[in-house]
Each structure stands twice: as C-alpha cells, then as structure tokens.
Amino acid sequence: SELGADIRMISKSTYEIDTSRINCTEVSNELSRQMRASYYFLGALLGRFGSAQVAMPGGCNLGPRPIDQHLKAFTALGADDSVEYGMIRVKADHLQGAHIFFDTVSVGATMNAMLAAVMAEGQTILENVAREPHVVDLANCLKRMGADVHGAGTDVIKIRGVKSMH
C-alpha cells in the first residue's frame, strides 16, 4: 500500500495486513480524496505514532462529514488538533485514557476514538457511542491484535490501553 503496509490475500474473504513497515504519519491528499473515510487513519496513526495528518475525506457525495466529535475524542485523549487548508492534523506527546461522552452518536468518531484509545495509557470510557455491527467487528479485530476492549455493541465502550499490539 502507499503507506507501506504489505497486504496479502489469504482467501476470498480473508486478508493478512502487515503494518510493521509503516513509518509515515501523513496520508497524501491524493489517497485521502479517493476514500470516503480517510479520517480513520487519524486514530490509527495517532495511537501508533503520536501524530497524523490526513486530508479531509472524499470519495462520494453522501454529504458533509463533520469531524468535530472525532477531534473532541482526540483532544480528550491529550492530542492537539488543527484543520487548515483541507488538512486535519493531530499530535500528542502522550495519549492518556479519558472519559468521553459523544454529543451525537457517530460511527466514525466511535471507531476513530477506539483506534487511538487502544494505545493510550490507562482506561478510556466512551459513552453515547455507535452500536453498529462494524463497531463490534472493529472491537473484535482490535482484541485479536492484543487490545483490551469491552462493551462494543452497547452505548458504553471501555478500553484499557496497551503498550503494543500485533
């Protein structure tokens, strides 16, 4: 992939993704504009590297994609954020678990907060979260990778940060 991940198809419905070679925290404008949800890179890269830069999402005409709840979660975890010239930037010297209540239910903000919080120190409690099946799928995937996530599928998700994942 453009970021440096190795992707291998194991079967028709199973892929193996090796991210050990990723060392980049910026997702290019070109790549971001091809995806409807490029902002998911923010939580994953912030959690892993402490910073991320991603262009505003593109990819389809479903309407505006507000990111205020995403940024609220990142800020609560200890990150600084800025949005300038169509680029979203987040940076943290140290991610710390937090209690986050989302003002509105958002699948994207829920998943992005989960992606960052799994690497934060301490416990994160996410309230008023999305309950969609893909939120549960992400929680299950993160657990298989070594994360400590409970409550996906309910309106409260509890995450205890880990030092590393596989």
Locate the predicted segments by residue:
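Structural preference for solvent-exposed beta-strand-turn elements
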Residues: 1-166
